[in-house]
Amino acid sequence: VWKGNWENDMRNSVHNMRREFRYTNSKSAYFGQLVEPRKTEIDTMQNVYPYPRKIEGDIGTLTNTSTSWSGRTYQDFIVYRLAETYLLRAEAYFRLNDLENAAKDINVVRERARAKPVQASDVTEDYILDERARELITEEPRRRTLVRMGRLVDRVRKYSIRELTRTSIQD
């Protein structure tokens, strides 16, 4: 979803997305070194992938729930965001073939993210889904959105990182 806009969107910055992982066991010979990505299906490191830092929480002692690594699962969570409202309305405008207003709504969200504005001619259903992924990562029940839009199967086939998932999902 960042292709063509890799450096031009603060939602993708190193401050917002963790892409580097380091060994943290101080007794290990690997301490402080980067964890190299694995490519095989049998290695558990296949499950280490970039994620948004907003779910990291504070890395502290595991016994202290107010500061421990818990993915912030103990904190309040967002139900609706203004950005989601703009993106829903952009989708409605798109379905009415009003690409100018769809682009305006998307650009409200992109402006806040300091991302390059989208042109009306570039607004497609895929673009709206990609923008939802960029903006609402970990906040949106993505599966429900894809089902609602009738796009679950084709998006899984196109983007799943696991071949078995891509090839076994059924219409």
Model-derived regions: residue spans:
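Long, intrinsically disordered, low-complexity segments
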Residues: 77-79, 110, 118-171
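Sequence-pattern detector for short linear motifs
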Residues: 22-25, 41, 92, 135, ...
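Extended, hydrophobic/aromatic-rich amphipathic alpha-helical segments that build helical scaffolds
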Residues: 9-14, 76-109, 125-135, 139
